[in-house]
């Protein structure tokens, strides 16, 4: 870097014009520009608050009758007395999802299981066995609280969990 600066100085000495020095000298001699003052107003902050994301999802409104036209149904007020509990998602839906991997492996996933997940697995197998004619293939992950079932049974399992009171 020092060599390039030296060459540039020599070039400027030969031609009589020094390059790059004028801007540096100007920037060092001038003070900071005078910016206009600002006024802090709290009246318009309501418009800023509308843009900020909500910190939590609000509770769903009360309806006259259930299920609602969208098919949503609240959980039973006293939770069912079972050794396991399936917590609702943050949007207040039952956490049963379809999953497809490797292009054709169809799975149904029940998430947010708390408590005895093995009891839930046994109850799910008892529920799905008459529908399939055989015991479904399941996978339990105790750490993440998920139960995976081979095949698409999301609608049946959602209805079954609603019937149980989750």
UniProtKB/Swiss-Prot annotation:
One of its GO terms (biological process) is mitochondrial translation. It comes from the Eukaryota. Its main location: mitochondrion. It is found in: Mitochondrion. One of its GO terms (cellular component) is mitochondrion. Residues 56-78 are annotated as: Disordered. Belongs to the mitochondrion-specific ribosomal protein mL49 family. This is Large ribosomal subunit protein mL49. It comes from Homo sapiens (Human).
């Amino acid at each position: 870097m020092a060599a390039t600066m030296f060459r540039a100085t020599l070039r400027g000495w030969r031609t009589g014009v020094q390059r790059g020095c004028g801007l540096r000298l100007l920037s060092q001699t001038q003070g900071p520009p005078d910016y206009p003052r600002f006024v802090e107003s709290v009246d318009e902050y309501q418009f800023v608050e509308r843009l900020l994301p909500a910190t939590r999802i609000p509770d769903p409104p009360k309806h006259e009758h259930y299920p609602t036209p969208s098919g949503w149904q609240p959980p039973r007020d006293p939770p069912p007395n079972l050794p396991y509990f399936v917590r609702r998602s943050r949007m207040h839906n039952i956490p049963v999802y379809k999953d497809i991997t490797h292009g054709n492996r169809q799975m149904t996933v029940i998430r947010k299981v708390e408590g005895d997940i093995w009891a839930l697995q046994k109850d799910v197998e008892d529920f799905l066995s008459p529908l399939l004619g055989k015991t479904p293939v399941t996978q339990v992950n105790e750490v993440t609280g998920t139960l995976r079932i081979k095949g698409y049974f999301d609608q049946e399992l959602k209805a079954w969990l609603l019937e149980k009171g989750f």
